[in-house]
Regions:
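Electrostatic, structured charged patches in enzyme active sites and in nucleic-acid/phosphate-binding
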Residues: 1-132
Length: 132
């Protein structure tokens, strides 16, 4: 039998994408958590529920490039992008009864990239990410 390669079924971590209220979620777990949080918001247990909120962990890194005209006259310096910013995208962000901001992430598998971003988030914003 000839080798035909391997074929991946589904997503990278075997999550099933779902659509709830016209919103596409990466997994059933995330969709179910959204439904729970929506009920809590209706019951006034939480407020200001937001989805897929970006938090900047490291800003863009620029270098200044000196420029000169044809006759040697200095021109306005140009900013050159060296590295793009690092962003953590939270699944859910809301405010609890005590007025505290809660950042939630539904995780089935913790990647090394996620663990590093979680640590950078704690360092920069001063409160942890809640994992569901």
């Amino acid at each position: 039998m000839a080798y035909r390669g391997w074929r991946r079924n589904g997503t990278k971590y075997n999550a099933t994408k779902c659509v709830v209220d016209g919103i596409e979620f990466a997994s059933k777990r995330e969709a179910n958590r959204y439904l729970e949080l929506r009920l809590l918001e209706r019951a006034k247990e939480i407020s200001d529920l937001r989805l897929q909120v970006d938090f900047e962990l490291i800003p863009n890194q620029y270098a200044t490039e000196k420029r000169y005209g044809k006759n040697g006259q200095p021109l306005k310096d140009k900013q050159v992008l060296l590295e793009r910013k690092v962003v953590y995208r939270a699944d859910f962000v809301y405010t609890d009864k005590d007025g505290k901001t809660v950042v939630e992430d539904t995780k089935g598998f913790r990647t090394t990239e996620y663990v590093l971003k979680r640590k950078m988030f704690l360092y920069k914003y001063g409160f942890p990410i809640t994992e569901i």
